[in-house]
Amino acid sequence: MFTGIILGKGRILEKRPAGGGMLFAVQADFDLPEPEEGESIAVNGVCLTAREISGRRFVVDVSPESLNRTNLGKLATGGLVNLERALRLSDRLGGHIVSGHVDATTPVLERKPLGDFVLFTFAVPEDLGKYIIEKGSITIDGISLTVNSVDARTFSVSIIPHTLQVTSLGALQQGDTVNIEVDLIGKYVEKLLSVKSNDGEKKESKINPAFLAEHGFLK
């Protein structure tokens, strides 16, 4: 589990086929205190297992599913990635709950400088528009961000100078592809509201709009 608060960037030192997937060797631009072999680390928002940790360098194995669903397969040797270590119970929840399971990729439609800030506009991935709400949270390449605005086809986020400096968004350009993870809570609520029995018949869930309104989740 992660929060979308990026510790820093990393650079891909090596990328090669391995066991049907790919092996990435990554060099972080920050120290990895108390490294644990087999710990989870988010690379561009993709939850992976770190091994062969040596100083700031580590290796991850990327499965065919992750290569197909994320932008990792498109990254070249020398490319930048965002890095976050797994959440500890004692950590601050500075962003929002992020699973590290990417839902889709989407292109950058526009990069618009606004003084020291940058406004990015992205295409809404197919079937994910219902989870993207104005002023809600979204994860882009592992970064917890707030949606500025959204319509049926596009959504935008405003990036502060600090985020531009410490993440890969500073180098992101129109036409680039990013990883998207929508709000996990929204997906679970939808699932609970559409529960089906073992025979495929829809069951009436105790968690319905009336229940949510009664307990203050809906107005």
Regions picked out by a protein language model, each given a short descriptive name:
Residues 1-219:
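Conserved loop->alpha-helix
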